[in-house]
């Protein structure tokens, strides 16, 4: 099924750059019905507010393609009760939904960072850890500044302290 519209989500510049780097230069995410992100998007679809304006500066925004969800689903609770969601009218993601999607993408970046660091980690010297963090930021076109490096190194040190015995890369089948 083809999707017909997109919804804009404010995620911040760093997440925008990460999505563009992982998505072949595009800031539009194409979803599958079986993903967690589609579940979050579908829960938070809403009608356009009256004060909605078209976004000119897209440096902090990504777009999510809305799948065709024009279908009837009958549930066993009450007879003849159907849910009908049409993305023609529900093409806006609420503020709470945008925050949930931003948190989900932040967790995905954090998981990708930890897997990257586990694969690059050798003996744990501070200079090598900072170099690995810098190469992660440059590989995913994220801005390199002291605040982000300090935040990621703090996250890595806490993760390493908590999971000192588990330095394997997870493999999913």
Where are these regions (language model features)?
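Major-groove recognition helix of helix-turn-helix-like DNA-binding domains
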Residues: 144-163
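Short amphipathic alpha-helical segments that mediate assembly, nucleic-acid/protein binding
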Residues: 12-16, 38, 98, 110, ...
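Intrinsically disordered, low-complexity serine/threonine- and proline-rich regulatory segments
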Residues: 87-103
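Short Lys/Arg-enriched helix C-cap and helix-to-coil transition segments
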Residues: 163-173
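Positively charged, polyanion-binding regions of nucleic-acid-associated proteins
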Residues: 102-124
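Long, low-complexity interaction regions most often at the N-terminus
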Residues: 1-86, 90
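Short, charged amphipathic recognition helices of the HTH superfamily
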Residues: 120-140
């Amino acid at each position: 099924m083809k999707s017909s519209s997109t919804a804009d989500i404010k995620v911040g510049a760093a997440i925008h750059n990460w999505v563009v780097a992982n998505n072949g230069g595009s800031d539009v995410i194409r979803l599958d019905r079986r993903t967690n992100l589609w579940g979050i998007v579908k829960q938070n679809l809403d009608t356009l507010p009256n004060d909605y304006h078209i976004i000119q500066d897209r440096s902090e925004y990504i777009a999510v393609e809305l799948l065709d969800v024009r279908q009837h689903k009958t549930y066993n609770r009450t007879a003849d009760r159907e849910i009908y969601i049409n993305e023609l009218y529900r093409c806006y993601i609420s503020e709470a939904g945008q925050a949930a999607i931003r948190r989900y993408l932040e967790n995905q970046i954090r998981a990708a960072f930890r897997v990257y660091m586990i694969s690059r980690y050798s003996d744990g010297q501070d200079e090598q850890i900072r170099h690995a963090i810098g190469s992660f930021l440059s590989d995913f076109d994220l801005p390199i500044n002291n605040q982000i490096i300090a935040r990621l190194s703090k996250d890595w040190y806490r993760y390493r302290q908590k999971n000192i015995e588990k330095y394997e890369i997870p493999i999913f089948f």
